[in-house]
Amino acid sequence: MYVSNHRSRRVARVSVSCLVAALAAMSCGAALAADQVDPQLKFAMQRDLGIFPTQLPQYLQTEKLARTQAAAIEREFGAQFAGSWIERNEDGSFKLVAATSGARKSSTLGGVEVRNVRYSLKQLQSAMEQLDAGANARVKGVSKPLDGVQSWYVDPRSNAVVVKVDDGATEAGVDFVALSGADSAQVRIESSPGKLQTTANIVGGIEYSINNASLCSVGFSVTRGATKGFVTAGHCGTVNATARIGGAVVGTFAARVFPGNDRAWVSLTSAQTLLPRVANGSSFVTVRGSTEAAVGAAVCRSGRTTGYQCGTITAKNVTANYAEGAVRGLTQGNACMGRGDSGGSWITSAGQAQGVMSGGNVQSNGNNCGIPASQRSSLFERLQPILSQYGLSLVTG
């Protein structure tokens, strides 16, 4: 086990296979996609990620490659597959990287850089499962509390399981790992500013209130048969809680799960109009689908408190140790967020809906926007499981 204050460990570079040729083959379609990106979204990506309009076509090409080749890459490397992600080069361009614990140094798939690492994804996931089991086995009032332990997840880029802890709580993280029985050599303890918490209960964007008491943000428009609705975070309200927008009752919470997961959907009255859009300041981003993006992909989020912010996906299958209980299967990004953004949308530049805001490492000012992007933990519940569990259809344009 090793301890760090920021992500510093890098796996060794091995080889690059035909990235230019692979991207050139997709250039026509990607250029069209870049032209379709909302101007306000381009501005936000440049502001938050340093992706300039001239770099956007090549980024979109790489993002498309990651989406279309992810399953094939995993099949190619089999049991020795150690993950894949999008990475930015020093010159500002992007590439798709795949890792393997085997000896192979290249891929038969064009446009994929291969890196050799120590542990397979299956080995790291096993350590992750031991941490989850250790947390589940704790008995409230009997077991030592997990105070100071924020979250844990597999990070393919550093080939480790990362356990995030509060500043000054490294010992708590070490104890947690030791008691779980996980292989400490596969784990990195990383300190994180702020305190992990869900993000409801402060005022603000496109918002809705719950029982005239707390405030959250709308996720995405959905339908269930003829019933209209929207998805949001489960911690925002209980079943049958009333949702209001602009003071008017628009519906009630039809179902929710929290903790364990952090998902819910609100059933709306028939008078409401569903739009396939996400607010982006004075403009809107059209929702075009719900294909999940890769680690390293650019992603933006919208909420009533901090508005429209962009970042990248930094981890998947994260377990968050909220005060209310552990929530599993979250995705982590580094777009900044604040209290009240809960339930709000996460979406890619290509209009692919990703999920709804859950929580993050919030500072005393109510957000994590002042924390360096490399240390932000902004967590969202994936959209696809919400749609599947409740039999919902995403409204797209």
UniProtKB/Swiss-Prot annotation:
The active site is at 235 (charge relay system), 262 (charge relay system), 342 (charge relay system). SUPFAM superfamilies: Alpha-lytic protease prodomain (SSF54806), Trypsin-like serine proteases (SSF50494). One of its GO terms (biological process) is proteolysis. Keywords: Disulfide bond, Hydrolase, Protease, Serine protease, Signal, Zymogen. Disulfide bonds join 216-236, 300-310, 336-369. InterPro entries: Alpha-lytic_protease_prodomain, Pept_S1_alpha_lytic, Pept_S1A_streptogrisin, Peptidase_S1_PA, Peptidase_S1_PA_chymotrypsin, Streptogrisin_prodomain, Trypsin_dom. GO terms for molecular function: serine-type endopeptidase activity. It is an enzyme of class 3 (hydrolase). It holds the Pfam family Trypsin. Gene3D superfamilies: 3.30.300.50, Trypsin-like serine proteases. Residues 1-24 form the signal peptide. It catalyses: Preferential cleavage: Ala-|-Xaa, Val-|-Xaa in bacterial cell walls, elastin and other proteins. Residues 25-199 form a propeptide. Its EC number is 3.4.21.12. GO terms for cellular component: extracellular region. It comes from the Bacteria. Belongs to the peptidase S1 family. This is Alpha-lytic protease.
